[in-house]
Regions:
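Sec/Tat signal peptide C-region and signal peptidase I cleavage site
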Residues: 32-38
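Transmembrane beta-barrel domains of Gram-negative outer membranes and organellar outer membranes
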Residues: 38-278
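Gram-negative bacterial Sec-dependent N-terminal signal peptides
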Residues: 24-25, 29-32
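Bacterial N-terminal signal peptides that target proteins for export
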Residues: 10-23
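Short, Lys/Arg-enriched N-terminal segments with co-localized hydrophobic residues
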Residues: 1-12
Length: 278
């Protein structure tokens, strides 16, 4: 017996709901039982809100997007996002951030097969001063690269590069800022060039029990097709220690304020971040 697309969707939604409820219960228990952590844990929670903090981390971010095409298809993306800071002088770091997507996409129209595989890798290099500015601002800038690592049907099949930058400020538990990049393709057999701007304004608040509430958008403007894709994400995260290792769990939802025709309407997110403080 082969499950229909509707039965698959219902099963996936039930699984997602169970996952969300379980995580929320774990967070509630952690909040009720959380002991006072030392100052270094408070600093760790703060660094988690900083995309260019000097902190080795491995986030595993799962995204379920629903409502694609006339078949209301689902797309699942696991973003593997290791972050590696390197000290290059007494005053400067370079922060290397990768996004390695693993994708399962149902066919959004009848007759189009489901696809599973690797997406194109994006790698960013942020050169950042170790100390904030006199006004408390943290910033970094450098190049970003697009590698055509994806499997057929999930890749632009283009090499790309461009500039990237981030600026943020942290005060009284609040973190706010903007991460941006622009990628132009310069080689590759893909039929359509890549010419895209990515904008991620973000604001977050971390409580004294290391619970973080975050609101952001992950907006992309495709200059080739004159199209916006604007998911608005609302997320809650909890920092815990499990077996002595600091781990952050995050859950959230998103709504697409603007999107190309046939793209998803809404989605869910669950992420686990493994931290390796020095």
């Amino acid at each position: 017996y082969v499950l229909s697309k509707e039965e698959k969707r219902m099963t996936q939604m039930k699984t997602s709901k169970t996952l969300l409820i379980t995580l929320l219960m774990l967070m509630a228990l952690a909040l009720m039982a959380a002991p006072l952590w030392a100052q270094d844990e408070a600093e760790l929670a703060k660094k988690l809100q900083n995309p260019i903090a000097s902190l080795i981390s491995v986030p595993l971010q799962s995204n379920w997007d629903f409502g694609r095409g006339p078949e209301n298809a689902m797309r699942y993306t696991l973003n593997i996002q290791p972050v590696i800071p390197i000290s290059i002088s007494n005053d400067w770091n370079v922060i290397i951030r990768q996004i390695v997507p693993v994708i399962y996409a149902e066919g959004p129209v009848k007759g189009l097969d489901d696809r599973t595989g690797l997406g194109d890798i994006v790698q960013s290099f942020f050169f950042s001063p170790k100390a904030p500015t006199s006004g408390g601002w943290i910033w970094g800038a450098g190049p970003v690269f697009l590698y055509p690592s994806g499997t057929d049907g999930l890749s632009a099949r283009k090499w790309g590069a461009g500039p990237t930058a981030v600026v943020l400020k942290q005060e009284s538990g609040w973190t706010y800022g903007l991460l941006a990049n622009h990628i132009w393709s310069f080689s590759g057999p893909g039929q359509q060039d890549v010419n895209a701007t990515f904008l991620q304004p973000f604001v977050g608040f971390t409580t004294k029990t290391y619970t973080t509430f975050t609101l952001n958008t992950e907006s992309t403007y495709d200059w080739e097709n004159s199209e916006w894709r604007v998911p608005v994400n609302l997320m809650v995260a909890q920092l815990l220690k499990i077996g002595g290792m600091p781990i952050q769990f995050q859950v959230g939802g998103r709504w697409f304020a603007e999107k190309p025709e046939g793209e998803a309407d809404w989605g869910l997110r669950f992420a686990v971040t493994f931290l390796f403080p020095k």
